[in-house]
Regions:
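TRNA-recognition modules of translation machinery and tRNA-sensing kinases, especially anticodon-binding
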Residues: 1-170
Length: 170
C-alpha cells in the first residue's frame, strides 16, 4: 500500500435518505446523486497536502458552476466522524443553515460551532462577524484512523513496522 500513497477512491451514485422533509431544495430530497471520495495516506504531511488540494478543487468546481463568489469554506461540526469538519456553504436567502462570516478575511463558521474556543482558534472576534443564511453544498473532513484502526487497514514502513492508514473524506 505505501507505494500507492496517496490513494483516492470515489463513487458517484444515487443516495436515499429518510429525511422528514426535503431540505435545501433539490440538494436534500429523499433521493439525490452524490459523490463520495475517500483518501488513504501513510503520513500526516501527505494527508495535509492532499486535504489542502481538495479544498482548492472544490473551490474551482463551485467557481465553474457559477456559485464560487457565494460559497465559503466554513468551519463546522464533524458530526459522528470527527470533532470538526469543513463545509462549503453557499449564501442564499432560502438557506436553512446559519453561518457567521468575517467579510474582511472570508473566514466562515457554522452557527453550531460558534463558541469562544472556536473563535480563538480561528483568530476571530464575534463583533466582526455577520450572520448569513446558507445551504451546505459539500463537506470534507479528516477521518484520521477512525476506520483504519478497527478494520486493521495498515501499511508497513521501510523499517517493517505496521502503522494505521490515515484517511480523509470528501
Amino acid at each position: 500500500f505505501s507505494s500507492d500513497s496517496p490513494l483516492a477512491i470515489y463513487q458517484i451514485q444515487n443516495k436515499f435518505r429518510m429525511e422528514l422533509r426535503a431540505k435545501s431544495g433539490i440538494l436534500r430530497g429523499r433521493e439525490f446523486i452524490m459523490k463520495d471520495m475517500y483518501s488513504f495516506h501513510t503520513s500526516t504531511e501527505d494527508f495535509e497536502k492532499f486535504y489542502e488540494k481538495m479544498k482548492e478543487v472544490y473551490k474551482t468546481i463551485f467557481g465553474r458552476v457559477g456559485i464560487g463568489h457565494l460559497t465559503y469554506l466554513t468551519f463546522a461540526s464533524g458530526g459522528t466522524f470527527s470533532k470538526y469538519s469543513h463545509e462549503f456553504q453557499t449564501i442564499t436567502s432560502l438557506g436553512e443553515d446559519t453561518i457567521y462570516l468575517d467579510e474582511a478575511t472570508g473566514t466562515a463558521l457554522n452557527k453550531e460551532v460558534l463558541n469562544e474556543e472556536v473563535l480563538k482558534q480561528l483568530n476571530l472576534t464575534k463583533e466582526k462577524l455577520v450572520e448569513r443564511k446558507s445551504i451546505e453544498v459539500g463537506n470534507i473532513f479528516d477521518l484520521k484512523t477512525k476506520y483504519s484502526e478497527p478494520f486493521e487497514l495498515s501499511f508497513t514502513d521501510e523499517k517493517e513496522q505496521k502503522h494505521p492508514v490515515l484517511m480523509g473524506c470528501y
